[in-house]
Amino acid sequence: MAAKIKKGDKVVVLTGRDSGRSGEVIQVLPKEGRAFVRGINLVKKHQKQTQNQEGGIISKEAAIQLSNIAVADANGKPTRVGFRILEDGRKVRFAKTTGDQIDG
């Protein structure tokens, strides 16, 4: 299946405690069906002190299910993603709500 959400996409969270918030995709894990989104689903991690890093409690992003996020269109609203083949043979993604091209 083609990737509907890619690294660098602007996405909106649909469900969960961060519902309605938006952020940029940092990393996608297609086999697990999860993605990391900057500033979303933050968890506290207890970091042990090392020689080059001090210890303490740090906040970092945790993975979020791909089904709980949607690509944001030009207006910042969640949209479904479709695929189109252009005249020159390239396959590009487009927003189903507005019809605008997402990449390419």
From Swiss-Prot:
Belongs to the universal ribosomal protein uL24 family. It comes from Methylobacterium radiotolerans (strain ATCC 27329 / DSM 1819 / JCM 2831 / NBRC 15690 / NCIMB 10815 / 0-1). GO terms for biological process: translation. Keywords: Ribonucleoprotein, Ribosomal protein, RNA-binding, rRNA-binding. Part of the 50S ribosomal subunit. It comes from the Bacteria. NCBIfam families: rplX_bact. One of two assembly initiator proteins, it binds directly to the 5'-end of the 23S rRNA, where it nucleates assembly of the 50S subunit. CDD domains: KOW_RPL26. GO terms for cellular component: ribonucleoprotein complex; ribosome. InterPro entries: KOW, Rib_uL2_dom2, Ribosomal_uL24, Ribosomal_uL24_KOW, Translation_prot_SH3-like_sf. GO terms for molecular function: rRNA binding; structural constituent of ribosome. This is Large ribosomal subunit protein uL24.
